[in-house]
Every structure is written in structure tokens, then in C-alpha cells.
Amino acid sequence: MALLQIAEPGQTAAPHQHRLAVGIDLGTTNSLVASVRSGQTQVLLDDQERALVPSVVHYGEQQKTVGIEAFTQASLDPQNTVISAKRLIGRSLADVQTRYPDLPYQFIASDNGLPLIQTKQGNKSPVEVSADILSHLNRFAEQRLGGELSGVVITVPAYFDDAQRQSTKDAARLAGLNVLRLLNEPTAAAIAYGLDSGQEGVIAVYDLGGGTFDISILRLSRGVFEVLATGGDTALGGDDFDHLLADWIAQQANYKPQNANEQRELLTLATQTKVALSQAVETEVKFANWQGTVSREQFNELIQPLVKRSLMTCRRALKDAGVEGEEIREVVMVGGSTRVPFVREQVGEFFGKQPLTSIDPDKVVALGAAIQADILVGNKPDSEMLLLDVVPLSLGIETMGGLVEKIIPRNTTIPVARAQEFTTAKDGQTAMSVHVLQGERELVEDCRSLGRFTLRGIPPMVAGAATIRVTYQVDADGLLSVTAMEKSTKVQASIQIKPSYGLTDEEVTQMIKSSMTNAKEDMEARQLAEQRVEADRTIDTVISALQQDGAEVLSVEEFKLIEAEIAKLIQLKQGTDRQAIAQGVKDLDLATQTFAAKRMNLSIQKALAGKAVDEII
């Protein structure tokens, strides 16, 4: 369904006026722009018939250049030429320096710990660099289409977290773009293939670009796209192939680059060699004083561990989707790195079928984004295409005992809103802390903290009387907002989740793997924590009752007996024997049965005091 546009009277567009919208594949290595023109989806080309725009910005003393012109400066002025900024976006400086120690840039930390790149034009954040690329693409598109853009759809890796998605939107706003939607790259590819060829069934989208890897398992049925599961690695791509090959060449030449210029030249040589080996079984290489031959077989051996790593992620995605390999009808290849013959061969063997490559893997994402942009801008009001993305990691809340209650499970279709009701743990409690978590584990300590906020103004009541409704809402861009509301007073508080930096690939992998490898231990830990919470509640209830009525209805011996059982349960609660704690709760319940009966009688006596029989009857 297209979005309706509202305008002032007399200022509405002509009923059939075509609004200009484009899809932008904002890639790690290269970017592309595509648009629907005269019913045909096309990638926009420059004057030299080139579609790929290098995702590179050069900050010179006099001017700023973007794209091919900037790329030519990479070996001449590497410290002021920013390449692969997408890898840096949404990450902390510490993370960047740990993960990418060989980058030629001079970094400093911003006030919030994010990286700033020192250039001749001042300090630049990855968001600003991305904004410069998007501004360039915007001007290029408007020049080619002959008018102002009404909106854009920008693609992002499916594994981008909230911080990385928000940073991408911030970059687009800096560039003056109207973002209709952020779209997962594999989903964009599914749109391009699904609509053009009318395929139905379960498909796998294998997306290996310059800097990121994504796998999505999708079901296509009668125009409905549903993402069954996603997986990926935010630090695996063709750039890593280049680095491995560059290191190998340097070893063969017995020469280590002495400065940033030589390092950049070596990486450029590695990239050229990789491309050549996609066409030939061997190629000549010259570096420093060394000249030799590199074979495709040698290159395959170098990259085999990385390709296997991607296939392990594919296996997990299939398991998450609940489908077997033989159920996959088609495998779509996306990203320039899928041109490597070894990658296509290994993916084909893994899924047991020849991958689809009929659409240029460099262009397929941009083409799908253009189709979606054309719909969202209102050019296809009758379109019946339905697009369903998913939440890649479960979203939950901390509960008593350090436990995690999942509100939105992993792989839930978005946009989505889910609500759950909670209550107070203590008598007279007037505030509640809401701790938002991300991950698959059962305990808070094993999940990722996304943010906290406090709901204040809860009416003081006995424990368990107040009702707080907590709502989690994920929008179409994968951004999360959380609201907590006390139902009787309607008082509420909320938070928009914008983490200060993104997940590392180790954290992403751990979150997915650990929920399976630690499932038994996690469940035992959860059951122990729940038993401790029950013990705490029982102890608090009994102590409160003793304070109110104990002295009035119990003898000294009875009082001491209950206190002894409380002390015993407190001691048991410190241990790890769940069954012993459960027995301690039962023993305390048994010891307080007489007390409970006496309290009930006392309450009845107080209620009937001073009343005549006929008043009661």
C-alpha cells in the first residue's frame, strides 16, 4: 500500500504525475543508485557508462571529492582518503582500533567515544563521511533524472544494529534526503528477483559484499515476502579477501610495506589480482622487487576459512528458519564478492543447487530498493506487494532475580509492537526501573544492555497490586522504542533505543551461538534464579505479616519457630541447590499455616466487632 500525500488546497500534484524516487545501495566498497523509469528498473550510469560509485571521500586542502576521483587519491594521500566508512559507522573508537589496526587514518575520540578521522578539512565522523557520499549520489541522481527527488530507500546489511541504522539515517538527513525507508540488503535482492521472475517458495539470499556478509532465508508466496530468518557477519567481505591476498604477496616478496602509501598500493594490487583470478586460472603479480604467479587454487586456499565461516552462518540461519537445505528452491547471489568462482562453487555445493546470478550481483540490491522506493513514494498505489522484515535478535526486559523476559522474540516480523504487564515487587513501591536487553540468553549478565529508564509516580500499594504495561515497538527501520505505563494513573515513561556504538562480530556470533551451546546450563540457572525469587517473596510476605500481627496472635515459641524457618531459608537461598530451596519454601509455608489461620480469625473478629447479629445476617 502506498503512502497518501496531503497538500494544501490547489497545491496537489497532478493525479498521474510521476514522483522521482531512487533506491540507494550504500555499500562498503561501492555504492549504486537505481530508479524506475517508464516502468523499467534501471541503475543510473555516469557519462562513461559506469554504475559503481566508489564509497570513498577525499578531503583535500582546497576541495572535497567523492567517488572515482576520490579513489584515485587513495594511494597518493591515504590519511585524507576515507574508504569503507560503512565499517566504522555506529562503532566506538576502541572497537575500531581493535578491529582495524592497519587503517591509515589518524583517529581521535568524540565526546561520546565515537571515532573522528583527522583530515585536512577537520575532524570527520563516519556519519559525516557517509553523508558526503549520499550528497554526491543525490546530486548525481537529480542530474540524471532531471528533477528533485521526492524520497529515497537506502539499503543496510540485515545485521546492522540500532546504532548503525540510526547513524545511517542521520547521515541521510545531513545529506538533505527524505528517507522513505531503510531496507535490508537481502530483502531488496528478494524484491528484485521475486517480482521480476515471479518465483514462489523458500529462497536463500547469500550476500557477500566488500565489508559485510548477510544470509537471509525468505518465503515468497503470491506476492508476499516473508523473511524467515537472518544471519550475518558485520566484518566479513571482499575486503578481507584482499587483506589475506595482500599479506600473502608481501610474504612472497619478503617485503613489509613501510608506510601508508605502500600499504594502499599493496591492497590495490591485491584487489586487481582477485578480479583477474575470477576470469583466469592464474595471473602475474609484481610487487617491490618480486615478480611471480598467483593461481586461483592458491587464492582459494587463502580464502577457504572465510568462505567456510560464511557457510556456518548459513547453516544457523536454516536452523532458525526451521527449514532443511533441500527445501531451498533458489539461491540468490548478491554482492561483488560472489563473482569469485570459489564462492559460487562452495555455495552451490552447500545448498545443492546452482546459485542464481542472472541479475548483476553488484546491481540487484539497488534495483530492489528502487522498486520499493517507487511504491513508497506513491507511484504504484495499486501494488499488492507486502514486505515483512524480522528482528534479528530477541528484545527483552530484566525481571527479578536477574532474569530476562523476552518481549519480542528473534525473527519476529517487523514492524511490530508487543506489550506485557508487570507488577511491583515491594510494598509501597512508587518507581520501577526498566532495563531493555538484547540477546538469546536467560540471564541479564549474558545479554546486551540497550538502555534503561525509570517509571515514577506509581501509586503506593501492596506488592503485586499495581499493574505496569510495558510496550516494545520496532519500526520498519528496525529501531526500537519502549514505553512503560501504570494503568490506573496512566503515568508513563519511554525511551528510544540508540546505543552509543554497534555490536562487534564476536558479540553477534556469541549471541546466536551461546543460546544453543548453553541452553541446558541457562535453563538450570533460570530455574535456580526463579526459585530464589519465590523464596524472597515468601520471606518478605511472612516478615510483613509478623510485623503486623505476629505479636498479637503468636506465642513466643511460635514466633521463634517461624523466625528459625526464615533464617534457614535465607541460608539455603545463598546456595545453588534448587531442590533444597524449594523444600525450604515448603517448610516455611508449613510452619506458618497456624499463623495464617490465626490471622484470618483475627481479621474476622475485627470486622465483626461492635456489630449486631441482625446487621451481619
Curated annotation (Swiss-Prot):
Q: Which SUPFAM superfamilies match?
A: Actin-like ATPase domain, Heat shock protein 70kD (HSP70), C-terminal subdomain, Heat shock protein 70kD (HSP70), peptide-binding domain
Q: Name one GO biological process term.
A: iron-sulfur cluster assembly
Read off the InterPro entries from this record.
ATPase_NBD, Heat_shock_70_CS, HscA_NBD, HSP70_C_sf, HSP70_peptide-bd_sf, Hsp_70_fam, ISC_FeS_clus_asmbl_HscA
Alphabetically ordered keywords of this record = ATP-binding, Chaperone, Nucleotide-binding
MF GO annotations:
ATP binding; ATP hydrolysis activity; ATP-dependent protein folding chaperone; unfolded protein binding
Which family is annotated? Belongs to the heat shock protein 70 family.
Q: What does this protein do?
A: Chaperone involved in the maturation of iron-sulfur cluster-containing proteins. Has a low intrinsic ATPase activity which is markedly stimulated by HscB.
Protein name as annotated: Chaperone protein HscA homolog
Per the UniProt entry, what species is this protein from, by scientific name? Actinobacillus pleuropneumoniae serotype 7 (strain AP76)
Encoding gene (name): hscA
